């Protein structure tokens, strides 16, 4: 059996500082923009010449936060309620023999300055610090297949949770929006996806959660109406 070694070509900069609450696919949280910073020796303007003519990219990356857990032959996809097992190769699970992921993202801008090459990205589903091993332009004529079937994931999951904020948090957000544009919308879109583990859904009201987004620990509670954000703590 052959083995291969790959070099990291870049790193992701993202508002998601931990894997909890990262959307399961790009495009679900529209306000979650990020960047891909190429690293030496790949941070050359020549390496991205012509890339600006493409609207979207495939990013191939490493599941660096789960790779120590090894691979599993079967997993439980969240879209199936977290109870039904499927073969790992029939899912997008992180627990793969080779911890490689792929993400289709919008390319907003290519910025080259001296030894810096930065790709400005649209809505993404990657944790801050994610290692990138390759990028490829998206080719609509070959890769857009409207008639394809996709089993349990034929359509995007609905944003099912109503998200509200306490008066104190709303006051904080008004001030923070100057430095973090669309912060309120970002938090709302992330939590509306209901990032809780599938087995936690349907639990009693009052349960609290926290997630690290941007530079803040966002704390929220389960209510009869959905989720209520009650604290925004700088980190």
Give names to the regions the model predicted:
Residues 1-45, 51-53, 140-190:
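Arg/Lys-rich, positively charged N-terminal/basic patches that mediate binding to nucleic acids
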Residues 2-8, 95-105, 214:
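Short coil-to-beta-strand transition motifs
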Residues 17, 110-116, 225:
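Short, conserved beta-turn/loop elements at beta-strand boundaries and strand-helix junctions
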Residues 49-101, 191-193, 200-204:
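Active-site-adjacent substructure of cysteine-protease-like catalytic cores
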Residues 114-124, 229-230:
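Short, solvent-exposed secondary-structure boundary/capping segments
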Residues 119-153:
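Flexible glycine-rich active-site/ligand-binding loops centered on an Asp-His dyad
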Residues 217, 222-235:
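Enriched for short, Lys/Arg-rich terminal
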């Amino acid at each position: 059996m052959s083995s291969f070694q790959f070099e990291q070509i870049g790193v992701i900069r993202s508002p998601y500082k931990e894997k909890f609450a990262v959307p399961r696919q790009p495009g679900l949280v529209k306000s979650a923009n990020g960047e891909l910073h190429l690293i030496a020796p790949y941070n050359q303007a020549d390496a991205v010449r012509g890339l600006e003519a493409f609207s979207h990219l495939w990013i191939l990356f490493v599941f660096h936060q789960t790779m120590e857990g090894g691979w599993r032959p079967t997993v439980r996809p969240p879209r199936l309620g977290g109870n039904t097992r499927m073969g790992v190769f029939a899912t997008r699970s992180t627990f793969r023999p080779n911890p490689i992921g792929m993400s289709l993202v919008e390319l907003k801008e290519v910025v080259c300055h001296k030894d810096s090459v930065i790709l400005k990205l649209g809505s993404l589903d990657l944790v801050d610090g994610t290692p990138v091993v390759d990028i490829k332009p998206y080719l609509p004529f070959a890769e857009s297949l409207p008639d394809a079937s996709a089993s349990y994931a034929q359509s995007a999951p609905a944003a099912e949770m109503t998200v509200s904020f306490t008066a104190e948090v709303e006051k904080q957000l008004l001030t923070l929006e100057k430095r973090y544009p669309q912060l309120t919308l970002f938090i709302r879109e992330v939590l509306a996806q209901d990032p809780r583990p599938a087995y936690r859904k349907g639990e009693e009201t009052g349960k609290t959660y926290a997630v690290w987004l941007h530079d803040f620990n966002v704390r929220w509670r389960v209510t009869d109406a959905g989720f209520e954000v009650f604290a925004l703590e700088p980190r």
